[in-house]
């Protein structure tokens, strides 16, 4: 069977906008061995492209963006509380059976297909449906330090005690995976260079391959 290449619309995080910051912050990380930080990871940062965030799959974290059919209006939801408020708002404005199953307890399962049953309403009164895409699973991994404590919605003090990490150990292959997404999200979410992601110690495992 032939391999077919065709263009698709996608959502991106403009990581190139903070490239210089990420490069500088990388120099504050205590890499072991140091050559991983200056070489493999440093080179990856120097040649980074914008992060393709969206995926065309069924299983995963849905992209929390709703759009009108004409694509002129959209909303990005930032929390479960905001989503449930928008669910009720849409039911009041659009009427009928809009979101009838989610008006009392709110939405309990944020995954497909349930989240795609939700209709929201735009500022001009038009119905909005969620875009079909999911979020890159590496975003979930990079968001782990925040998500595990439901930060910033609660556990702020607990989060402050454990972030940033004192020590992270993973395989060298994670320079393009988990290490990168941790570094990218940490750089994007903090407001000043001094508050950016600064792991106090980070080491990589070396894979030894043996022929049997």
Language model regions located:
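Structured secondary-structure scaffolds
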Residues: 1-212
């Amino acid at each position: 069977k032939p391999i077919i290449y065709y263009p698709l619309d996608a959502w991106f995080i403009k990581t190139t906008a903070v490239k210089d910051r990420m490069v500088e912050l990388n120099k504050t990380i205590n890499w072991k061995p140091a050559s991983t930080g200056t070489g493999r990871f440093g080179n990856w940062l120097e040649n980074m492209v914008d992060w393709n965030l969206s995926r065309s799959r069924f299983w995963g974290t849905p992209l929390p963006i709703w759009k009108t059919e004409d694509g002129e209006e959209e909303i990005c939801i930032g929390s479960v509380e905001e989503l449930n408020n928008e669910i009720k708002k849409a039911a009041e404005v659009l009427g009928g059976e809009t979101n009838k199953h989610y008006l009392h307890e709110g939405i309990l399962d944020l995954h497909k297909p349930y989240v795609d049953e939700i209709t929201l309403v735009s500022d001009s009164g038009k119905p909005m449906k969620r875009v079909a895409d999911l979020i890159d699973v590496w975003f979930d991994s990079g968001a782990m330090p925040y998500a595990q404590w439901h930060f910033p919605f609660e556990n702020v003090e607990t989060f402050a005690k454990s972030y940033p990490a004192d020590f992270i150990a993973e395989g060298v292959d994670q320079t393009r995976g988990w290490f990168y997404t941790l570094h990218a999200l940490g750089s994007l979410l903090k407001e000043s260079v001094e508050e950016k992601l600064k792991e106090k110690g980070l080491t990589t495992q070396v894979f030894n391959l043996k022929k049997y």
